[in-house]
Amino acid sequence: MTSHVMPTAERKVRVDLAERSYDILIGPGLIAAAGKEIASRLKGRKMAVITDENVAPRYLEPLMASLGESGIEAVSLILPAGEKTKSFEHLIPVCEAILGARIERNDAVIALGGGVIGDLTGFAAGIVRRGSRFIQIPTSLLAQVDSSVGGKTGINSAHGKNLIGVFHQPDLVLADTAALDTLSPREFRAGYAEVAKYGLIDKPEFFEWLEKNWQAVFAGGPARIEAIAVSCQAKADVVAADERENGRRALLNLGHTFGHALEAATDYDSKRLVHGEGVAIGMVLAHEFSARMNLASPDDARRVEAHLKTVGLPTRLADIPGALPPADRLMEAIAQDKKVKGGKLTFILTRGIGQSFVADDVPSSEVLSFLTEKHPR
């Protein structure tokens, strides 16, 4: 695979959005260097740090120390960990913490954690004072390569995932790759699903590279940094071209229409299914459905499933512990998805590995028939 970024120990990816452009820094030691990096970019010297009970014991103290060394005064709020934290119940305390810290125009809110903390904190920053500065310090692989980049923020609803939120771009993303060393194997695998997604969207050579080098990515070191940097560059390019998801950005949702429905069907119970696992199953289903519609070869679907299964990800509905609702109930969840326009189902389908496209008129009857075959119970 041809490298898409400079061959240095620390990588920098620029998200080009005119006056709202920002940097993504990728490499080890960035939490300890956060104060210096933030102080060099922002004039404000007051910060509110939002994190969760899993991340705080490891990284809150080093972050607060780094901020203090750079003359930044910070307060912190520690929330429960897990997908259910993305709710109105926890949004209000975050907003109050930001206001209580007297965060002003040049100050910032810092999200220290995975995708849940980033999405929730970004939403709060987007609505407090009609928009506060916001810094992402993602500590999970999924957050580093996906949710921390691009400005999508939000919380879940009883009607579905991420249905309440705003676009609010961060001012800086610090992806400390050393933080990934403390992830559980399951968490890392879940994030890897989003890495593989970029290859499946439009970078077949990257997917092939992952097939050959995934063990090195899991082990850490240069291959891991390379995979994260390529993923961030891929997302940055898409976001720069289509920030508000009016066209090309929708491709980033490959696997997510099925995946979000499965997350809702399991009541966001992380013991049964986490987001990246839902995406993995969703990407296999998207390739299988594309083959069913005679858009792609069944061999491509088998290849995608084989790779995701090799790294230890679930790839079939039967891999999800416990009972799932019937196919018609899954269809109801799909119909609530944000990728529905004019009552017509919009899916990201594929013509082959790295040849994904937006299909905005998918017959619901075909999807229901497909799901019934895959999940006859």
Swiss-Prot record:
- Which is one Gene Ontology cellular component term of this protein? cytoplasm
Q: Which residues bind Zn(2+)?
A: E194, H256, H275
Domain of life of the organism in this record? Answer: Bacteria
Pfam families cross-referenced by the UniProt entry: DHQ_synthase, DHQS_C
Kindly give the Gene3D superfamilies that the UniProt entry links to this protein.
3.40.50.1970, Dehydroquinate synthase-like - alpha domain
Which coenzyme or cofactor does it need?
A: NAD(+); Co(2+); Zn(2+)
Q: What class of enzyme is it?
A: lyase
Q: Cofactor comment in the record?
A: Binds 1 divalent metal cation per subunit. Can use either Co(2+) or Zn(2+).
Residues holding NAD(+) = G115, V116, I117, G118, D119, T139, S140, K152, K161
Q: What Gene Ontology molecular-function terms does this entry list?
A: 3-dehydroquinate synthase activity; metal ion binding; nucleotide binding
Q: Which UniProt keywords apply?
A: Amino-acid biosynthesis, Aromatic amino acid biosynthesis, Cobalt, Cytoplasm, Lyase, Metal-binding, NAD, Nucleotide-binding, Zinc
Cite the EC number: 4.2.3.4
Pathway where it operates:
Metabolic intermediate biosynthesis; chorismate biosynthesis; chorismate from D-erythrose 4-phosphate and phosphoenolpyruvate: step 2/7
- Biological processes per GO annotation: amino acid biosynthetic process; aromatic amino acid family biosynthetic process; chorismate biosynthetic process
In the record, the note on similarity to other proteins reads: Belongs to the sugar phosphate cyclases superfamily. Dehydroquinate synthase family.
Job description of the protein: Catalyzes the conversion of 3-deoxy-D-arabino-heptulosonate 7-phosphate (DAHP) to dehydroquinate (DHQ).
Under what name is this protein listed?
3-dehydroquinate synthase
Native source organism of the sequence:
Rhizobium meliloti (strain 1021) (Ensifer meliloti)
Its gene name is aroB
